[in-house]
């Protein structure tokens, strides 16, 4: 069996913990029944022992199977393309992939709602798991332990230019930087900007994204710990990025632009930040896929 799950970029400026989108950079997971347990990891995280011994994919996969009375062993080949601890949904990709794979082996129907709500048990950030499951641009929240979300597709004439620094940032640690309370003004600012940004994406008003993607809740505090991120954002917006936001909790930076502007934006960012990876990616509208039964 082969299951693939896309990278994601969440928060997107004002959409803290509720907005996210899917990027066409896929982890592929190859699983087959075996008389013994074996895991091989290729790509991102390769050669790092803890990603094998503490692998979230196999943990979730086996837990779901055992819950349904299956105690079999499997061989796993995890082909990771999503950067780890860089704010591009590596954990969500692993968890969603494990859930979808386990359900397929159990003979369950391919039900995205079932996948996303099971994934929520292991990953409580719906802004990451919804685009990983459904693809596209998603708005989501959790009510009574159930994910409520809507998706819209992202057109192919838009591209993502991702700047991926060589610095890991822990989501858990970065949350400790944030205040426990926000003022009414800060809250209204983010609510209004996130709402209008979603409308702009749905209606294709791309020229509004620059002003709509501003944030007063989380980005500044997080970016202060790694000031080069301010420079990335400034240069991206000066070179035709429609919006430029911290990807998840960082350290990666998400930039959206028109297809014709992507090569130049990549060139400028690569020149200014030669030690960082810069990648032009398509958006993904498919989400998790069973590529081979």
Curated annotation (Swiss-Prot):
Pfam families: GHMP_kinases_C, GHMP_kinases_N. It is found in: Cytoplasm. InterPro entries: GHMP_kinase_C_dom (IPR013750), GHMP_kinase_C_sf (IPR036554), GHMP_kinase_N_dom (IPR006204), GHMP_knse_ATP-bd_CS (IPR006203), Homoserine_kinase (IPR000870), Ribosomal_Su5_D2-typ_SF (IPR020568), Ribsml_uS5_D2-typ_fold_subgr (IPR014721). Its EC number is 2.7.1.39. One of its GO terms (cellular component) is cytoplasm. ATP binds at residues 83-93. The keyword Methyltransferase does not apply. One of its GO terms (molecular function) is ATP binding. It catalyses: L-homoserine + ATP = O-phospho-L-homoserine + ADP + H(+). Keywords: Amino-acid biosynthesis, ATP-binding, Cytoplasm, Kinase, Nucleotide-binding, Threonine biosynthesis, Transferase. The keyword Cytoplasm applies. One of its GO terms (biological process) is threonine biosynthetic process. Pathway: Amino-acid biosynthesis; L-threonine biosynthesis; L-threonine from L-aspartate: step 4/5. Its main location: cytoplasm. Catalyzes the ATP-dependent phosphorylation of L-homoserine to L-homoserine phosphate. Belongs to the GHMP kinase family. Homoserine kinase subfamily. This is Homoserine kinase. It comes from Helicobacter pylori (strain ATCC 700392 / 26695) (Campylobacter pylori).
């Amino acid at each position: 069996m082969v299951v693939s799950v896309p990278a994601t970029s969440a928060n997107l400026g004002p959409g803290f913990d509720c907005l996210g989108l899917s990027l066409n950079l896929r982890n592929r997971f190859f699983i087959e029944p075996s008389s013994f347990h074996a895991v091989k990891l290729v790509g991102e995280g390769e050669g790092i022992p803890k990603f094998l011994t503490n692998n979230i994919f196999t943990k979730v996969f086996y837990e779901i199977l055992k819950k349904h009375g299956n105690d079999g062993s499997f061989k796993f080949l995890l082909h990771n393309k999503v950067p780890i601890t860089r704010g591009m949904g590596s954990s969500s990709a692993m968890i969603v992939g494990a859930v979808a794979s386990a359900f397929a082996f159990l003979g369950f129907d391919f039900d995205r709602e079932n996948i996303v709500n099971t994934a929520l048990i292991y990953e409580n950030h719906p802004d990451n798991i919804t685009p990983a499951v459904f693809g596209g641009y998603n708005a989501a929240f959790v009510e009574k332990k159930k994910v409520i979300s809507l998706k819209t597709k992202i057109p192919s004439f838009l591209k993502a230019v991702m700047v991926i620094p060589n610095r890991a940032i822990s989501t858990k640690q970065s949350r400790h930087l944030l205040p426990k309370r926000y003022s009414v003004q800060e809250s209204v600012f983010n609510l209004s900007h996130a709402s209008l940004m979603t409308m702009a994406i749905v209606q294709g008003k791309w020229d509004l994204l620059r002003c709509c993607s501003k944030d007063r809740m989380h980005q500044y505090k997080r970016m202060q710990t790694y000031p080069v991120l301010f420079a990335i954002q400034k240069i991206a917006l000066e070179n035709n990025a429609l919006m430029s936001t911290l990807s998840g909790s960082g350290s990666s930076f998400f930039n959206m632009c028109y297809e014709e502007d992507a090569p130049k934006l990549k060139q400028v960012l690569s020149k200014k930040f030669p030690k960082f990876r810069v990648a032009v990616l398509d958006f993904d509208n498919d989400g998790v896929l069973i590529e081979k039964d």
